[in-house]
Amino acid sequence: MQDIRVAAVASSSRVGEIQTNLENIRQWSAKAKEQGAELVVFPELSVTGFWLHRDAHRYAQPVPGPATDTLAQLASEMGVLLAAGISEECQGRYYNTHVLVSPSGILGTYRKTHINPYESPYYYEGNSLSVFDIGKARVGISICNDNLYPENLAVLALKGAEVLLMPFAYGGSNHNLWLASSACAAYRTRGLDLGCFVVAVNNAGPVPTPDGETNRYPGGAFVSDPEGEIVARTQGMGPGEKMLVADLRAKALHDRRSVPHFTLRLRRPELYGRVSELL
């Protein structure tokens, strides 16, 4: 790993208003670039918006497709890497997907692997845990509910991930309460256990939906280091859009992983078979 500067943007994504959302991504990416960011991370379904409804699939996009082409164009114009969420249509199936885009095109895609009961009528599960080399670091992506499964993230780390991107559409309206929640503490602990940086970013709200309802999100983002300590977090009380910029220092990762008692080095896989068995 080499030092890399990242931005996490707690953006507000309008359901189905893809061009509006892409323009918002462009504007925030430009602000991040002005502050020297090399990788800009956006929340879950940030391109298409998050809507659990039978009509939501009308907004799903092919990957690659026009929306990801626009992301690649933005990445090329600004000379940054972008990570953004999209409702993906593939051969009649729909996936909650995050795409990693470089100036030369799509570097990789990740489909959410742990679909909760509220989402299962609308999305299929992904079946792959991949790590992507972005030049200065190797990153893994784990979307919202996926981050409640330590095994998911452990596999990414064992495959070489140094940075874990965690995009969310986690409900609520209080920015500070979300960042102080036991859930966010758990996400930081995943980074501590695995010796990884964590870049977590939530949707901002409120966001009206086409059926007259309102999705409420607290906004917010944080970066924690391989010791599980917060190195940057968004500020302010309200749920509006926010951005942080943070430097991920390679030395912090090296120091955490070089200690004799580093957890991954002392694993006992022969004892863990039950973890892979269904209840």
Residue ranges and their predicted role:
Residues 20-29, 149-154:
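Short, acidic/polar
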Residues 2-6:
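Extreme N-terminal starter segment of soluble prokaryotic enzymes
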Residues 63-81, 148-241:
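CN hydrolase (nitrilase-like) catalytic-core segments centered on the catalytic cysteine
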Residues 251-279:
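A conserved C-terminal secondary-structure "cap"
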Residues 89-189, 254-255, 259-262:
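Active-site catalytic loop in hydrolytic enzyme cores
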Residues 10-15:
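Short polar catalytic/cofactor-binding loops
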Residues 18, 26-107, 170-194:
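Cys-nucleophile CN-hydrolase/nitrilase-fold catalytic domain and related Cys-dependent amidase chemistry
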Residues 84-86, 97-100, 130, 221-223, ...:
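Short beta-strand scaffold segments in enzyme catalytic cores
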